Amino acid sequence: MDGRSMIPLKDIVPSAQTNIKTQFILLDKGRTATEGQNKTCLALVADETAAVHFQLWGDECDAFEPGDIIHLTNGIFSYNRKSLVLRAGKRGNIEKVGEFTMAYVETPNMSEIRWAPDPNNSKKYVHEAVISTHSRIFPPLA
């Protein structure tokens, strides 16, 4: 384990760096799609502070199920086809560390926020607007 502390989902921001260390519960999983040689699927994940869309690749699509608690190291939060997703990326790692027992919220969804470059620091992003309070891909059950 590296020395960095875990980041709550509400504190993640878009970045080209793979440095996100966090833990969340998988709430829902979309259809598996094939992009060239790669199999992908989108999931809705959350912790006690926020929710986000999480991109699973290849064998990860079959390895994780709703209810799994997942630990992510060296993750990246960036755009994939105009959609902001959290993912492990090439250097990241995800592993199941438990199941079912984790407090979570479904709002805000960090993937449903429009981000803009920080006028004071072009390497950082700031919230510009909320596109939707809930996931538009995984609507709330209520």
Question: Where are the regions a protein language model picked out?
Answer:
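OB-fold nucleic-acid-binding modules
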Residues: 1-34, 81-142
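Short interface patches used for recognition in eukaryotic signaling and trafficking proteins
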Residues: 6-8, 51-58
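Hydrophobic residues positioned within well-ordered beta-strands of beta-sheet architectures
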Residues: 22, 43, 72-73
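Short, charged beta-turn/beta-strand-edge "cap" motif at the junction between a beta-strand
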Residues: 75-81
